Design a protein with these regions (language model features):
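Alpha-helical transmembrane segments and membrane-interface helix-loop junctions
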Residues: 1-163
Length: 163
């Protein structure tokens, strides 16, 4: 299972990186077009939507790396069951948030699925909104993985991987 989750995180990071490249390319094209006094209408919308994909894809991977939201300063000072309780509480709160967001973002994605892009009406907005349930679902998976790792560390009395 860990191999699959690692593969999934790498895929998500690759998608986020590609989206960031598209964002930069669209932004540079927009700047160049303005400099040359040429009207390229679609670059702004492509840049914004690519940026959304880059941010949400990267945020999910950062949840797995424990670099997105954490109270590490306090957790690093605690040991044993006290540290485990704090870390599990923190990750449980995040998990509830991510599961709720995943659930409701499916509804949002469904609602806006057939909306069209303003400058590229052949494209559907649903593909942009799809990043929400994907990133929140994978964040939930990464949080569950992290919680299981923390429990294993405490049970085996090993040193945490992040310290």
């Amino acid at each position: 299972m860990e191999r699959f989750i690692t593969w999934l995180a790498r895929l998500q990071l690759a998608i986020g990186t590609l989206a960031l490249v598209i964002f930069v390319a669209a932004t540079l094209l927009q700047v160049l077009a303005r400099y040359l006094n040429i009207s390229v209408l679609w670059t702004e919308e492509v840049a914004v939507n690519a940026f959304i994909w880059a941010i949400f894809s990267g945020a999910a991977v950062m949840v797995r790396e424990k670099k997105h939201f954490s109270f590490n300063a306090l957790a690093m000072k605690l040991t044993g069951r006290t540290r485990l309780a704090l870390v599990l509480f923190e990750q449980s709160v995040m998990l509830v948030f991510c599961v709720l967001c995943a659930f409701y973002s499916v509804e949002i994605t469904d609602t806006f699925w057939h909306s069209k892009w303003v400058t590229l009406p052949s494209l559907q907005q649903g593909y942009v909104w799809l990043v929400l349930p994907v990133s929140f679902a994978t964040s939930s998976l990464y949080l569950l993985e992290g919680m299981l790792k923390e429990i294993r560390v405490c049970v085996k009395r090993e040193k945490p991987a992040w310290s």
